[in-house]
Amino acid sequence: PAVRVVNPHSGEEIARLDGIARAHDVPLLIDGAYGMPFPNIVFTDAVPTWNENIVLGLSLSKLGLPSARTGIIVASEEVIGALGSANAIMSLATGTFGQLMAEPLIRSGELLSLSDDIIRPFYLEKSRRTLEWIDELFADDVEYSVHESEGAFFLWMWFKNLPITTYELYRRLKERNVIVVPGTYFFFGMKEAWSHSDECIRLNYAMPDKEVRRGLEIIAEEAKKAVSEGAVRSSR
């Protein structure tokens, strides 16, 4: 479970999860939309893992082809047969645009070089710049941490001293045309309340640099404003 910012699992972790799945006679499902072997938007030394008990989901969306709506499943022949039959029933006529584009790239190996040499470096640099801007823009009186950036298009920020919830911060940011995802949506199924779930946001840095920086400026302004409002209330 790592949907918040994409936390690439090591081979050891996958092996452990696979062992647990096998012990309960269920397949291990891996969502590899950002991972290996493509689009490889992974900034760690993770390695691709697959065996007959793993159902690996991949996508063309993060290669810049979201409208192709093409998902790729790597699984045993038995699982692929069942999925193919289900898909034939659920989708009367599935599009083939994505398949026609992807097949020659896969056969030639260009898909891997495109991922390794263009896509991964591009987003790694965008992540680095975004982290630098956060350090530059956020005031010292706004206490925050940023989860280690390990891949994908997102950063996870934790505000430690905001007097408002990050849902309220989201509402204020929306009024200024900045959209973030409040952290509360990522803590579903918990039996007990946890304040941390109301202290975090997820940011997307995939947009043009100018827009990303301006969005961060507005987030920093609203966070500082909220902290200042809280300080005023506390002094009364």
Residue ranges of each PLM-predicted region?
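Active-site PLP attachment segment
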Residues: 37, 45-85, 93-98, 212-215
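PLP-dependent enzyme catalytic core of the Aspartate aminotransferase-like
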Residues: 175-176, 190-236
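Active-site phosphate-binding strand-loop segment of PLP-dependent enzymes
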Residues: 1-39
